[in-house]
Amino acid sequence: MCVLFSAGATGVETYNPDVKVVIHVESPHKGTMVTWAENLQNNNVDYDILATSYYPYWHGTLDNLKQQFETVKNTYHKDVMVAETSYAYSLEDSDGHANTVRVGNNDNGADTTEPFTEQGQATAIRNLINTVNEAGGLGVYYWEPAWLTVGNTKGLTGDAYDAQVKENQ
C-alpha cells in the first residue's frame, strides 16, 4: 500500500506542489491511525494530512479519537482530520431498504451516546467537531448529507439515483 500511496503523492506534488496530500484511513479505533502513521513514516510516504472516517457506533469513543489525533500530530507531525462522518436522526425505515443504523444493528452500545433524533444528531456532530478542534484537527467533513429518503422506490426502474430523481420530479 505504501508504494501506491507514494506514487499517488508524487503525482499530486508533480501536478501542483501546493495541493495537500491526504491519506484517508477507515478507522481511528484500537490505535489504527497511529499504526498507519508509523507505517507511512517507516516507508517514507510523503503526505500532509492523515484523515479518518468516524462513526461512533463503529469507531469508538471521542476520547479515543482525540488520543489518536494528538499522538499522530505530536509523534509524526502530521495534520489530522475527520474526512467522513454522519449520525442518523431517525431509525425509521421510510424507503423499504435496510438502514445502515437500525434497531438491533448499531442502535445502542457504549459508543452510541446520543439518541437517534434531530437533536441527538446535532449534539453528536457538535461533540465531534469540538473534539477534533480540541485535538488540533483541521476539521470535519459530513458524509453525504443529500442522502435523504424519498419514500418507497420499489417498482421504479433504473438505478437507485434514477429512482430518486424520478420520485422527486
Describe the residue ranges of each PLM region:
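Conserved, mostly hydrophobic/aromatic
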Residues: 8, 50, 84, 121, ...
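Active-site cleft segment of glycoside hydrolase catalytic domains centered on the general acid/base Glu
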Residues: 1-40, 45, 60-67, 157-163
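Structural recognition of alpha->loop->beta junctions
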Residues: 40-52, 111, 115, 130-138
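Helix C-cap/helix->beta junction micro-motif
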Residues: 15-17, 76, 135
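Aromatic-rich peripheral "rim/lid" segments of glycoside hydrolase catalytic domains that contact
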Residues: 71-74, 90-106, 110-127, 131, ...
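Aromatic- and acid-rich polysaccharide-binding/catalytic face
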Residues: 23-26, 33-63, 71, 78-90, ...
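The substrate-binding groove and active-site-proximal loops of carbohydrate-active enzymes
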Residues: 1, 27, 51-59, 110-119
